[in-house]
Amino acid sequence: MKSPKIRFKGFDGDWEQRKFGETVIIERGGSPRPIDAFITDDENGLNWVKIGDAPEQGNYITKTAEKIRPEGLKKTREVHPGDLILSNSMSFGRPYIMAIDGCIHDGWLLIRDEEKRYDLKFLCQMLGTEQMLAQYRAMAAGSTVNNLNKELVGNTEVKVPSIAEQAKIGEYFSKVDDLITLHQKKCEQLTILKKYMLQKMFPQNGSDKPEIRFEGFTDDWEQRKLSDVVDVRSGRDYKHLEEGDIPVYGTGGYMLSVSEALSDDEDAIGIGRKGTIDNPYILRAPFWTVDTLFYAVPREKHDLNFVYGIFQNINWKAKDESTGVPSLSKATINAVSTMTPDYEEQRLIGEYFSNLDHLITLHQQKCDELRNAKKFMLQNMFI
């Protein structure tokens, strides 16, 4: 293939094939040793780039957690804004653009485009495509060390268009990355808000009132045992059932679908009996749960979403009854003390957190959709 399947309007003609190492400078990083002797808090120290400094989302290294003394410079590799660095671990193998000056250890490769043959954003995206990763894997096949190195990366073949088309492609993917980052940050902010509000809208430290309430509610909350709030029921084995459309849940979430329901019309909260015991989640009827997952059905005058908030506020790990695999019993769950208001206040609190969860889910779904779209476009806008 000499041109990609998807192109911007106005661009045609074949892409040019190049041996990558003949078009850029590729060098391995280095580490002064022992490295601990060179780490410094001095503001005049040199930025020391580690894997942990790379963002989970985005392509730019903008800061480092550590610095090294300038004396270590002769034993390392200096990098500058506009340089690309690539982790030499093939399981990682993701490129980043330096936005700051710094130094890299021998777990990084420096890629410097001195002759400006590439648009920087295009080059960063190209180095992370599945097409490039496939070349890395093929060249490393049979090697005893499954890592990237200067020779391997330099021997790859790349196919590139004009600088103008590169710039268009690079800018397009940069905007997609910005959108993903935006939705991811919104997700994180809402998750932090939810954690904060779970503390503020439920009584803490023996108090009989929460710090934050809806207008019009002033009465004290009443102390209850969870046994007064929910009916904790046991999951059961599903292997005797036929395939169907009733979801089966375990401690990790959805597993498969079967022909019968354990709960036909009562929504509940799933809480692990064994294994993952600190990840409660809402179960919508009809459903089936396996024997390692209890399902707690709210009793009359108790709102499901409010009760879910109670479950999220409990430190379930502290109630682990096993020295091996984490475990809970019905008796332990039933004995937990909690506080509840009247039903109308429960309903409003539950609705508030349900809306928050919905917003978090929407932003996460948007992130997933954008990542899938980006993956498709990377496969079709590069060769």
Over which residues does each language-model region extend?
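Catalytic core of tubulin tyrosine ligase-like
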Residues: W316
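A short beta-sheet element
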Residues: K50-G52, N59-E130, G250-Q312, E321-V325, ...
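Structural detector for helix-capping/boundary residues
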Residues: I6-K9, R18-T23, G52, E130, ...
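Amphipathic alpha-helical segments with low aromatic content
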Residues: M1-E16, T156, S162-E222, E345-I383
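Non-catalytic DNA-recognition/assembly elements of restriction-modification systems
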Residues: K9-S31, R213-Y249
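Short coil/turn segments at secondary-structure boundaries
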Residues: R33-I39, M139, K239-I246, T323-V325
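Non-catalytic beta-sheet/beta-sandwich ligand-binding modules that flank or precede catalytic cores
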Residues: W15, K19-F20, V24, E43, ...
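A short glycine-rich beta-alpha junction/loop motif
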Residues: N88, C103-L109, A141-A164, W288-T292, ...
